[in-house]
Amino acid sequence: PSDLTNRRLLYAVYLHEQTGLPLLLSGGAPGAAERSEAEAMAEILRRFAIEPGWVESNSRNTWENALFSVEYLQRSGIDQVLLVSDAWHLPRAVYSFEQQGMDVIPAPTGFESRCGCSLYYWIPGSWSFFLSSFAIREYLGLLAYHWGQAEP
């Protein structure tokens, strides 16, 4: 899994240990990968003797993560979730799950910030542009959802 996925997984495991709630792992195979993100996460958990409650490995985007995951949850009588994702991705993820009828408690991780007060921090750099691309994608995704379109 990617570093982003690992960060989310680590926080999900922390919350699982604190609450005893079951874990639903969601994520399809990125690009031409043979194994889905959800299957890769499940393998990591099993190495540490943690069995996921559900593994949803068919989704291709955030909307499908919600759509397919909610099917598993509703079959088990679950209508409220702690939703773990990066802070910058949570608004779109929460919206997607709420549109599927879930009561969502956001559980953000992966906050990106740099502190500093010098003038140097006001000069744009390549890392800032890279992070901005995430924000732009999320805002475009939310707009697309509100206009009834799929992922941009």
Regions found by a protein language model. Give the residues of each.
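A transmembrane-helix-recognition feature enriched in membrane-embedded lipid enzymes
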Residues: 131-152
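A structural signal for short, hydrophobic/glycine-enriched beta-strand patches
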Residues: 1-129
